[in-house]
Amino acid sequence: MTAGETRVAPPRQGPSPWSVRATLSTTVAVLGVAALLHFVRYTLLIVNRSVLLNPIVAGAATWLAVLASVAALFSVIGCAYVLTDWLIARRAAAFEHRHQPDPRPGWALRAGCLVPIVNLAWAPVFVLELALAEDRPARLRREIWTWWGLFIASTAVSVFATATSFTTDAQGIADNTVSFIVAYLLAMATVVAAAQLVFAVERAPVERPAHRWVVVAEEPAPQHEPEQKPEKAPETPAEVEREGQEPAA
């Protein structure tokens, strides 16, 4: 590269920051709506024990909850794909900045992030490796552990809610509805924690990693000695007498 040339940064790969934010916000909204509709359904189930509900109202509440569950499922899957693409692109940029290739191939990253149950162990490992590559494990520790804990809890409750969704008695349906409410709330909290983790990582660009500033004592200013005026030569008495002349009386 010659002196007159400027280095052009490589184009950003993976999803844009705007698309990541939009996906996370949409997923949180869909999960919140799903939790709300299941809460409405649970309320109607309680009311139906003492008051006979209109079949149209009962059917609408049931099908709206089902549609919300389907929308939440697709939203979570789409969010997982976008976050996986973001992680792969961020890791590639971080290791390229260190002049090293990513030690894990793309297929391994996708499998570890997208395969259910497997991603509980491997997805956080991939994020920890990213934090180490950017020399920021301590700064991101709280966000990583918060997201990881919520991820495990959300998966466990979701599996339990799905496994108990085939019950047919009234009490079992009510209990399963509560399980889904908790599952959606935990999933929403997990996505919020993932968003906070992404924002924390994006806060420091790869091209400008975080620095640790060290306070250095300021050197004392040099003291200038006052300028000394040159000594004035002693004045000699004016010559009033000339040779060959007597002094005046």
Place the predicted regions along the sequence by residue:
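Alpha-helical transmembrane segments and their helix-start/interface "positive-inside/aromatic belt" motifs
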Residues: 12-32, 140-147
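Cytoplasmic juxtamembrane regions at transmembrane-helix boundaries
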Residues: 85-107, 216-222
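Membrane interfacial helix motifs at helix-loop boundaries and amphipathic/re-entrant anchors
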Residues: 36-70, 158-184
